């Protein structure tokens, strides 16, 4: 049995750790514990609960209303790891500056980033959005259509990214990708980047934007991008979406080819 004296000796260390990592404890509570309790009580998924909230509070056909309502849900009701409004502005700027025609999104989740991109793309542009989870894909489709974007603008593909990328040219007639948004499993970032390189679908000026490269992090992806000589790399520092105090960032890779 631990004596009171020893316990008291460790108390300052414990308090220091709690204070230092308090935002991570809050994230654990919001993203894991709250979700588990509400899943048990409601009998439906967190993503479906978010859709029901958006359906009740947002204006159909108004993409900004959809995004604002989603942000309110994620910041005040339940945490969902969307790109969020702050990092979303980085994405908005890239879209405005580059006017991509063909976009590949890896990790649709609930469709937040899909809606954010679709509202800013030029006429004739098309998004191929890939989501491997069937339930998430179903929710995303409802949110994307509620925002007013049809199949001509957004094609949702419910398959793993490593199956989709090699067949984009053959199955969908894609010749070049102007922008790729990576926001799926972080361990897939580097393998999928290699698949994109091998496919020949990224060319001079193609942009790969990868979210959450600081937290939870994609160190191998960043290391390769910086060392391979194929990309100009810029990391946009930010905080984790809907959370204070947890550093995060987005990596912007511009393909320049072999130097």
From Swiss-Prot:
Its EC number is 2.1.1.6. Residues 1-45 are annotated as: Sufficient for localization to the Golgi apparatus. One of its GO terms (molecular function) is catechol O-methyltransferase activity. InterPro entries: SAM-dependent_MTases_sf, SAM_O-MeTrfase. Keywords: Catecholamine metabolism, Cell membrane, Deafness, Endoplasmic reticulum, Golgi apparatus, Hearing, Membrane, Methyltransferase, Neurotransmitter degradation, S-adenosyl-L-methionine, Transferase. S-adenosyl-L-methionine binds at residues 83, 105, 107-108, 113, 131, 161. The keyword Membrane applies. It catalyses: a catechol + S-adenosyl-L-methionine = a guaiacol + S-adenosyl-L-homocysteine + H(+). SUPFAM superfamilies: S-adenosyl-L-methionine-dependent methyltransferases. Signal peptide: none annotated. Disruption phenotype: Originally identified in a genetic screen for genes required for hearing and balance. The mercury circler mutant phenotype is characterized by balance defects, an absence of the acoustic startle reflex, failure to inflate the swim bladder, lack of hair cell-dependent calcium responses in the hindbrain, and undetectable microphonic currents. No morphological defects in the sensory hair cell bundles nor epithelium. It is found in: Endoplasmic reticulum; Golgi apparatus; Basolateral cell membrane. The keyword ATP-binding does not apply. Its main location: endoplasmic reticulum. It is an enzyme of class 2 (transferase). CDD domains: AdoMet_MTases. Gene3D superfamilies: Vaccinia Virus protein VP39. One of its GO terms (cellular component) is Golgi apparatus. GO terms for biological process: auditory behavior; catecholamine catabolic process; detection of mechanical stimulus involved in sensory perception; developmental process; dopamine metabolic process; endocytosis; hair cell differentiation; inner ear receptor cell stereocilium organization. Belongs to the class I-like SAM-binding methyltransferase superfamily. Cation-dependent O-methyltransferase family. Catalyzes the O-methylation, and thereby the inactivation, of catecholamine neurotransmitters and catechol hormones. Required for auditory function. Component of the hair cell's mechanotransduction (MET) machinery. Involved in the assembly of the asymmetric tip-link MET complex. Required for transportation of TMC1 and TMC2 proteins into the mechanically sensitive stereocilia of the hair cells. The function in MET is independent of the enzymatic activity. This is Transmembrane O-methyltransferase homolog. It comes from Danio rerio (Zebrafish). The gene is tomt.
């Amino acid at each position: 049995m631990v004596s009171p004296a020893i316990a008291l000796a460790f108390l300052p260390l414990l308090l220091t750790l709690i204070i230092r990592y308090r935002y991570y404890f809050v994230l654990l509570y919001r993203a894991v514990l709250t979700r588990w309790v509400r899943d048990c009580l409601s009998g439906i998924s967190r993503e479906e609960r978010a859709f029901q909230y958006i359906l009740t509070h947002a204006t159909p056909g108004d993409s900004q209303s959809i995004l604002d309502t989603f942000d309110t849900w994620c910041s005040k009701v339940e945490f969902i790891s969307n790109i969020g409004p702050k990092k979303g502005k980085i994405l908005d700027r890239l879209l405005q500056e580059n006017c991509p025609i063909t976009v590949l999104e890896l990790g649709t989740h609930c469709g937040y980033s899909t809606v954010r991109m679709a509202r800013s793309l030029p006429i004739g542009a098309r998004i191929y959005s890939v989501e491997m989870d069937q339930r998430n894909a179903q929710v995303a489709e409802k949110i994307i259509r509620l925002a007013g974007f049809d199949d001509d603008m957004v094609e949702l593909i419910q398959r793993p990214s490593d199956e989709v990328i090699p067949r984009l040219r053959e199955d969908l007639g894609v010749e070049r990708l102007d922008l790729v948004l990576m926001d799926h499993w972080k361990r897939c970032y580097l393998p999928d980047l290699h698949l994109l390189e091998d496919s020949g679908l990224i060319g001079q000026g193609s942009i790969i934007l990868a979210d959450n490269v600081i937290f939870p992090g994609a160190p191998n992806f960043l290391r390769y991008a910086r060392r391979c000589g194929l990309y100009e790399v810029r990391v946009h520092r930010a905080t984790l979406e809907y959370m204070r105090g947890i550093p995060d960032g987005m990596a912007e890779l511009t393909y320049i080819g072999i130097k």
